[in-house]
Swiss-Prot record:
Disulfide bonds join C28-C68, C39-C60, C40-C52, C69-C85. Keywords: Cell wall, Cytoplasmic vesicle, Disulfide bond, Glycoprotein, Secreted, Signal, Vacuole. It comes from Beauveria bassiana (strain ARSEF 2860) (White muscardine disease fungus). Belongs to the fungal hydrophobin family. This is Class I hydrophobin D. Residues 1-16 form the signal peptide. It is found in: Secreted; Secreted, Cell wall; Vacuole; Cytoplasmic vesicle. Its main location: secreted. Induction: Under normal conditions on SDAY medium (Sabouraud dextrose agar plus 1% yeast extract), hyd1D is increasingly up-regulated during the period of incubation. Hyd1A is the most active at transcription level under normal culture conditions, followed by hyd1B, hyd1E, hyd2A and hyd2C in order. Aerial growth, conidiation, and dispersal of filamentous fungi in the environment rely upon a capability of their secreting small amphipathic proteins called hydrophobins (HPBs) with low sequence identity. Class I can self-assemble into an outermost layer of rodlet bundles on aerial cell surfaces, conferring cellular hydrophobicity that supports fungal growth, development and dispersal; whereas Class II form highly ordered films at water-air interfaces through intermolecular interactions but contribute nothing to the rodlet structure. Glycans are attached at N36. Disruption phenotype: Stimulates conidial germination and virulence via insect hemocoel colonization. Does not affect radial growth and multiple stress responses.
Length: 89
């Protein structure tokens, strides 16, 4: 039981660890700094803006809006620092 919990915790930590941004991901300029283009779910009022995924496929899914986010060097599957984002028109 302890081994299973340790394995699950380790796997969760590896999945959530920061990674290099995908090579096909767009870059943008926000507040004078280079940022990443991210897609946020606009259908979920608060949580959708806080949990955004880095744009990897070139387009956002339906119900998502494109944002330019200053990730501050923290890139991964989920960008929690959506406070530093500007919506792209």
């Amino acid at each position: 039981m302890k081994f299973s919990l340790a394995t699950i915790a380790l796997a969760a930590a590896v999945v959530a660890s920061p990674t290099n941004p995908p090579t096909e991901a767009g870059s943008c300029n926000v507040k004078g700094k280079t940022g990443n283009v991210t897609c946020c779910n606009s259908a979920i009022p608060i949580l959708g803006q806080l949990l955004c995924n880095v744009l990897a496929s070139g387009t956002c899914n339906s119900g998502q809006s494109a944002y330019c986010c200053d990730t501050g060097g923290n890139t991964g599957l989920i960008v929690v620092q959506a406070v530093n984002c500007v919506e792209l028109l």
